[in-house]
Amino acid sequence: MPRLTFRACLLAGFMAALPGFAIAKSYTIPDPGAIAVVTLPDDWDTTEIAKGVESKSDDETVYVAVEVTELKDVSKAIADSIVWLKSQDVEIDRSTQKQGDITINGMTGVQVKWDGKDEDGPTHVSLTVLPVTDSKGLILTYWASPEGEKDNLKALGTIIDSLKPVK
């Protein structure tokens, strides 16, 4: 019995010492009637919202939201997202706008990126629209400090890799 306890303690210590080791939770977008699923780190502050999910990194330098949108209303959804960013004191520098096609796990859409600033300094901001069905799509809202983006690059890659349409 003492040998088993030692092994359990050794394993627990090893797991606790692993850098970046975090359990993650999957969310369906929206819930119910899912068209997509995304997995977010457990150590991020995640909240289910009316049309999806939003999450902020544990160091509070990165914000992501994944929401369902009606494709016929996508212009309104983008405008609403920009208004929401402004309500969070995020200022977008429209002169830095870059737009391009993007494909995430078979979903091809459009991404618009800007430089901006918030109360903490410079930020990177993007809005991405991904059609999933003939009538519904996802809008991804992203805002992060340049340093936060670097520090959370692995988690951000994992989030993007996890975003998949529900078939």
Briefly describe each language-model feature range.
Residues 1-10:
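Bacterial N-terminal signal peptides that target proteins for export
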Residues 9-19:
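Bacterial N-terminal signal peptides
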Residues 11, 23-30, 59-60, 98, ...:
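Low-complexity, Gly/Pro
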Residues 17, 64-67, 166-167:
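Alpha-helical membrane-embedding segments
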Residues 25-50:
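N-terminal "mature-domain start" segment
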Residues 35, 71-79, 146-157:
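Soluble non-cytosolic domains of exported or imported proteins
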Residues 42-44, 138-167:
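Surface-exposed amphipathic alpha-helical segments
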Residues 49-139, 144:
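Conserved polar/disulfide-associated segments of primarily extracytoplasmic proteins
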